[in-house]
Amino acid sequence: MARRRLTKRQRERIAQVQEERRDRLARQALNASEGEEVHQGRVISRHGQHLLVQAVNGQQYHCLFRQNLGEIVCGDKVLWQPVADDQGVVVSLLPRNTVLSRPDYSGRDKPLAANITRLVVVLAPRPPPTGYLTDQYLIAAELIGVNALITLNKADLLSPDEWQAFQQEFSRYENIGYPVISVSAKKEHGLEPLLEHLKGQTSILVGQSGVGKSSLINAILPHRDEAVGALSETSGLGRHTTSVATLHFLDNGAEIIDSPGVRSFRLGKIDRRELETGFREFSPYLGKCRFSNCRHRNEPGCALIEAVEAGNIHPERLKNFLHMAEQLD
């Protein structure tokens, strides 16, 4: 059944009511006393100057925040004061354990999500994955200090032999300590390996368009639409809530941040030393080259090249590193 379209007058009235509500909350926020009791909470979502904050007891509050707090994002831990039954004001941003950022249109890093512990890299047979892009995701995980999980999706698209060959392509990542799992949203129990790895973690899914991230999110969060609808009703943000980052809680203790912006994540601006650090298996060889200014291309006595020749570093990983290093020069 088609949704009834609102008249211009009705839309204007709704906008007016929402504006009056925002103004009222803003006045209450400004009048909040510094001496009043504060509570700790978690940012479930943000849209503009509006936050949905979940208190320790699980109740959610619609909050504004003070301008001097900087950029607050989904997953942040905050201190807030109540100003009404279901409304409050955030007065302090607590220190972050981790923050995932990506460059904005001006090239500056823009925080997307905070306090994550796991980056789930989703790959699929189609579109064909590239080691170059996969390595960018893994570098991001290394630099912000979170665990990475490589998830091979859409197992149902290939025969058992083809799938085994596809899995074999990623054995080089298992050899350097990255867990690799296979999942399918269409198979019975096809999500169990992923759910097991998500337990006790705050995770974000990243990957190319078309690898099935949305299908996995919808399968993991079957009541996602209901949660987004409740957020829309609570926040007064209407349809805009479908495109904002949202923190979801699973029954097994897992937390997932669902965000279109995060899912299309790309690596931000880094320097050469950070790039080297992002390749974890390079660590034993850094600083061991014959020349201190070694570029790891064809210099004699290059420790990385010798490690490749000895089978300790996969040649494609060094190739991808050199390609990325060119972008920095």
Question: What does each of the following model-derived ranges do?
Answer:
Residues L133-N147:
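Histidine-anchored nucleotide/phosphate-binding helix
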Residues S209, S214-S215, A219:
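Walker A/P-loop
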Residues L157-V211:
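Canonical P-loop GTPase G-domain recognition
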Residues P129, L158-S159, H189, R263-R266:
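Catalytic P-loop NTPase motifs of RecA-like helicase/translocase cores
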Residues I116-L123, I144-D156, E174-V183:
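Conserved beta-strand/loop subsegment of P-loop NTPase cores
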Residues A2-K8, E37, C74-D86, L94-R118, ...:
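Helix-rich effector regions associated with P-loop NTPase G domains
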Residues M1-G131:
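N-terminal accessory targeting/assembly segments
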